[in-house]
């Protein structure tokens, strides 16, 4: 969606900036994670059926849906940093996580799996759809990110 507003792909990271509020992050972490000491996996698939998001679920892990979990996505930074894995459809959450990771490297130790939309010409925040999988031309390559596309259109 950046290109629709004339923002170059490298500008979306270069000009991205926010001030962390670690006190708020800690409170949100306690509210969401609490005393549960299990490792957890975060996921966001607000558009079921529009992507091929499938991943193995292990009984040892807790699974937390990011959809509507907070009003301020930056309050979730500590929760994101401490996740075992993050699975996101190409959505708002994918864009926020990518920009934070590309600019600040906060999620370097967290495997992040990006699922493009499967319908032709269905725009996401990073990719267009699974037919454009080879055209993911981002200014920063992040080794902890993997595009998961089970079937091409």
Residue ranges and their predicted role:
Residues 1-153:
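Catalytic machinery of carbohydrate-active enzymes
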